[in-house]
Amino acid sequence: MINMKKEDLRIIFLGTPEFAVESLDKLVEGGYNVVATVTMPDKIAGRGHHLLQSDVKKYALEKGLPVLQPTNLKDPAFVEELRSYNADLFIVIAFRMLPEIVWSMPRLGTFNLHASLLPKYRGAAPINWAVINGDKQTGVTTFFLKHEIDTGDICQQRSIDIDDNENVGSVHDRLMHLGADMVISTVDSIIDGTFETKPQPEGEFLPAPKIFKETCKIEWNKPRECVRNLVRGLSPYPAAWTDICDANDSVSTLKVFETKLCDDLQSEQSLMPGDIICTKSRMAVMCADGLLEILELQLSGKKRMTTQAFLLGYKPKACK
């Protein structure tokens, strides 16, 4: 049993996006001793080339926490600075793959919060892929780091059900809150010596690779439920997309945010995948096994809108 109060446990927190901030906030507001944070370097963004700070950095500065932003995690100067904090525990959430010289540094080890029920969905985009694949359940896992990515011994897991109409934004937010609670629970179990770990099962499991632009392209020759799940799994960001032709055969990019299965629109002609049926206020696209109605969308250069608003100024012909 570790004989110390939570105020005496020196923690370094490593993370970047909003998903990580929720856990950091729980630690800080809960009186845990976060002695430093590590996050990505600022990025140049926008036409004005402004420096964009990570969500973790913004929060850390608000709370007066030290912020380390290494470009190279193996840089001797960074490693030495990290070591100077004499931390007992590292917590990693939505950061980068850590070298052993970093994750092996604290005496109590380094644990990670991962947004899946490991060993399923190891990789960069676990929430997206759970929804894209039509899973009915997902969750969060805390585990201790070792050499292979996302393969360490599991500390705790908690699960949630995924609603059939839920998009990845909603699942992300629920897992963010659930994960933050579990981070606290994991830290508490380490402090009081009640934590237990178990190895991850061996075998082949669905991965969660990084999402690229081509990952997001809709293939209308797939079953409509697969297309609907792709849209859900990428909404609101980065969003599924398709090329769309208007009545003049001009091609534009169309982002699709919300869809539903459609069985009440009919066509007098036989339809091929990508063909469109429209009324004054509705638009559906033919998939391999039926029509999928688009409810919310965004044409390139325009704002996000309902299909009804879109059809006031656009005459679609087909999707590609």
What positions do the PLM features span?
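N-terminal glycine-/serine-/threonine-rich beta1-alpha1-beta2 phosphate-ribose binding loop
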Residues: 44-88
